[in-house]
Amino acid sequence: MAKSSRRYKEIAQKIDRDRLYPLTDALALVKEVATAKFDESVDIAINLGIDVRKSDQVVRGAVVLPSGTGKTVRVAVFAQGDKAKEALDAGADIVGLEDLAEQVKANEINFDLAIASPDSMRIVGQLGQILGPRGLMPNPKVGTVTLDVASAVKNAKAGQIQFRADKAGIVHCTVGRASFSVDALRENIIALVDALNKSKPATSKGVYLRKMAISSTMGAGVRVDHAGIIN
């Protein structure tokens, strides 16, 4: 514990908490202090100017990160017939319908993302209490309930992430690994910011992207001057 506290203190001393760092500098600093014995994730928190109490100001969506996530994603697809074949051909790890639903009910959940064809939702809808709390319930708003299951599978395998503002209006996402280059991480963040801008509620007033900070799994947060990447 003492060793961990000392390490965190050393990291914190390298970061000026009152400074807004240019994105490239912030990423370089996050990589520098990511000294754990594993490949730490690089995470971002973005405060949005939305009123989360209003139903028309929900910010939710998905984006394919151009440099990927650095994570191997196991994809399950609820489908049958031609759609099941399309999913398998696209690289899905698990495909099924009633049989897959029974596995889920038995708490045998061996996947990181679930996709469903619209006609399968009569079965998948029964799994909400199991998949919902795990963040695995297919949803058309993020493209995981779709007729084009093949594209959904390919996007997931290519590094697609989902985002959603929490009750405080903050979006938390993993945008890569500490082993990624600064340029690769920067490309991913720009793609996420672009997706957030496209998801801006029409009723949102004032400044939309308010604050941004990045950190590694074991590192301290670095505040980012996001003025140059908001458009």
Swiss-Prot record:
Query: Which GO CC annotations does the UniProt entry carry?
Result: cytosolic large ribosomal subunit
Q: Does the keyword Magnesium apply?
A: no
User: Mind telling me which Pfam families this protein's record contains?
Assistant: Ribosomal_L1
- Repressor as a keyword? yes
InterPro entries for the chain? Ribosom_uL1_bac-type (IPR005878), Ribosomal_uL1 (IPR002143), Ribosomal_uL1-like (IPR023674), Ribosomal_uL1/biogenesis (IPR028364), Ribosomal_uL1_3-a/b-sand (IPR016095), Ribosomal_uL1_CS (IPR023673)
**Single GO MF annotation:** structural constituent of ribosome
Give the record's keywords alphabetically: Repressor, Ribonucleoprotein, Ribosomal protein, RNA-binding, rRNA-binding, Translation regulation, tRNA-binding
Q: Name one GO biological process term.
A: regulation of translation
**Entries under CDD domains matching the protein:** Ribosomal_L1 (cd00403)
Which HAMAP family does the record associate with it? Ribosomal_uL1_B
- Family listed: Belongs to the universal ribosomal protein uL1 family.
Q: What does this protein do?
A: Binds directly to 23S rRNA. The L1 stalk is quite mobile in the ribosome, and is involved in E site tRNA release. Protein L1 is also a translational repressor protein, it controls the translation of the L11 operon by binding to its mRNA.
How this chain assembles, per its entry, is: Part of the 50S ribosomal subunit.
Official protein name in the record: Large ribosomal subunit protein uL1
Question: Organism source for this protein?
Answer: Nitrosomonas eutropha (strain DSM 101675 / C91 / Nm57)
